[in-house]
């Protein structure tokens, strides 16, 4: 009986090793580096509030300028950025950003020091000709919001009109909105 089990185990493991070696194996770092090459910038929104947040998550959220609920930032895609987003995925939601969404955020919710609306003088002071040029450079990941000096590095959003359609306590794959969310741009448009 024992010999039969050993033979079965040898055949099973040799088959699996052959299957694994012959199939395409991709590591997690390969996938992340390929994503960074495809994605230029992320739109990140903090969904959960400040209560019961552990210190490690609070410091990561502070580094990303997401200190309050319903704040949004545009982050250039880097390896450390993806790691930070995955670390605090139970408090935020993120998606790749396009130029149209970046322009809408800058038009409606962009603020400068003193919490005043952005003017053309502020954009020219930042080194851009138009708001479209600024939105394009942000969505392509060429510049970070923290580098544009008269502008605030975050956007203060309101709760979405007509409420959340999915749960705010679960990840996107579990019928929630947290973590990587494919429908975040539509949600952000309802929050502007």
What are these regions, as identified by a protein language model?
Residues 13-192:
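Core subunits and conserved enzymes of cellular information-processing
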């Amino acid at each position: 009986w024992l010999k039969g089990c050993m033979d079965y185990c040898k055949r099973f493991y040799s088959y699996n090793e052959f299957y694994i070696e012959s199939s395409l194996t991709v590591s997690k770092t390969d996938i992340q580096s390929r994503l960074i090459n495809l994605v230029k910038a992320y739109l990140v929104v903090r969904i959960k509030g400040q209560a019961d947040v552990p210190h490690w998550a609070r410091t990561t959220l502070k580094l990303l300028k997401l200190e309050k609920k319903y704040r949004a930032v545009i982050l250039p895609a880097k390896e450390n950025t993806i790691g930070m987003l995955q670390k605090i995925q139970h408090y935020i939601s993120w998606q790749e950003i396009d130029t149209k969404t970046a322009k809408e955020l800058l038009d409606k919710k962009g603020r400068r020091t003193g919490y005043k609306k952005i003017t053309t003088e502020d954009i020219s002071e930042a080194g851009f000709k138009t708001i479209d040029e600024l939105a394009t450079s942000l969505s392509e990941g060429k510049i970070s919001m923290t580098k544009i000096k008269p502008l605030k590095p975050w956007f203060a959003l309101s709760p979405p009109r007509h409420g959340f359609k999915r749960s705010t306590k679960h990840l996107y794959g579990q019928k929630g909105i947290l973590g990587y969310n494919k429908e975040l741009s539509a949600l952000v448009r309802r929050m502007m």
